């Protein structure tokens, strides 16, 4: 199991704030060139309004970690829940209204890639698919502690204690 703390995440600036890349597959993937299958990130949003970038050919998932985020899509206002990933297609025109300094969690998956994503709590997994576990609170995996907003990556059966977002896939 590989543990990555939030201080180790690759950080970049964007027009609306700061993004921390948590995971990308393949490892040499390139966000700007859209050359990746799966990318997991978290953004600190400094603007109170922002537009989502076009990711045609990808499916997106978003979860607010801190603050409030409301999506504007097809003339509708969609307040996001802190307990449920919201799914939308990367080619949809989506903007958001946020509390200043809101923090979100994002998963972007290329169409055709089989990825299981979800929020789990106190679960065991019996297969060896590659799994990225993002801790929504202090958690443990097979007894090893993982801090809030840190990540564990593993490819073996495991038991999780606590609440986390998972992305499970075959490489």
List the predicted regions and their residue ranges:
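Jelly-roll (double-stranded beta-helix
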Residues: 1-171
